[in-house]
From Swiss-Prot:
Compartments it resides in: Cell membrane
Primary site of residence: membrane
GO cellular component, one term: plasma membrane
SMART domains reported in the protein's UniProt record: Haemolytic (SM01234)
Similarity comment: family membership: Belongs to the UPF0161 family.
A Pfam family the protein falls into: YidD
Function: Could be involved in insertion of integral membrane proteins into the membrane.
Topological relation to the membrane, as annotated: Peripheral membrane protein
Region (Disordered): 64-83
Sorted UniProt keywords: Cell membrane, Membrane
Protein name: Putative membrane protein insertion efficiency factor
NCBIfam families in the record: membrane protein insertion efficiency factor YidD
Length: 83
């Protein structure tokens, strides 16, 4: 339920608020897309945490660049992969 609410808020922002503002995100994917992917992949709480952490890095003093959502750690090894 919380996951759906958070995703709805991000989609609302992407569709209705973001188009009204100049593009300023220093990252790829954008902070809103990153947050959306993080919530979809990691769930509501960890995804929201990752999204907020990313948004706090998005300022003129940070170089930005490619910054994908981190993968989940495999409990049986030290590698990461999608489930």
């Amino acid at each position: 339920m919380l996951k759906k609410i958070l995703l709805s808020l991000v989609v609302f922002y992407q569709r209705f608020i973001s188009p009204l503002t100049p593009p300023t995100c220093r990252f790829y994917p954008t902070c809103s897309q990153y947050t959306r992917e993080a919530i979809e992949y990691h769930g509501a709480l960890k995804g929201l945490y990752l999204g907020v952490r990313r948004i706090l890095k998005c300022h003129p003093l940070h170089k930005g660049g490619f910054d994908p959502v981190p993968l989940k750690k495999d409990k049986n090894s030290k590698t990461t992969h999608h489930h």
